[in-house]
Amino acid sequence: MGTQKEPQVGMHPTLEQPRYFPDLHISLNVEIRYWITPRLPEYYTISVERGLSMLDRTGAKKHYRPDARIDRVESPDASYANTIVVQPPSFAVGNPSQPQRYLAIRDQDDNLITTIEILSPANKTGYGYENFRLKQEHLARQGVHLVEIDLLTQGKRRWQDERVDQAQYVTTVLRATSEIANVWAAQLGEALPTIPVPLRQPDADVPLPLEHILQEYLKKSGLARQLD
């Protein structure tokens, strides 16, 4: 009897190819939503968005496209507990936007708390990169927690740090109360990290195990067998 082959961990370069990445991008958003939903206090919702409208300081509407977002809605208090351990970040880098804090006008039913974005090739090249950078800077100034998941080795990264450049895969969490982003770096063949998804204080972060999410996608899509 042959020995069972251990599954490959971490991101696979094949998944960056145009043949595979669009499906990966869509499916990971869904997997992340399904993971986070039952772990949220009941007064939060998470949805996959095609666009996002916010009011800037002049009252004009800005339209952006995060991948997933978490909103808070009013409801009675709910208990929350989670025993999954979040890994410490690899290091921290300064936020290049240096956001200035100001009051934002928000609808009571649309209090944006967190965005989670899996970067696509369009986020890392040309005008797409510039638009992504400006969008993230605007959201940071609006007091939104930003989670960025970069599973692409090609293209520009908005975090200007040599350690970021040396990593093949990078996940960052920029909290609304900080100008320093926590960074989780991974190389080819390394498991993706478990990261915190921040909520509004005093609510606890939701641990997000990216390696588990990726492996679930590979198993459900049948790609786990093809990539071994």
Listing of model-derived features with the role each one plays in the protein:
Residues 1-228:
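Gly/Pro/Ser/Thr-rich low-complexity, intrinsically disordered segments predominantly at protein N-termini
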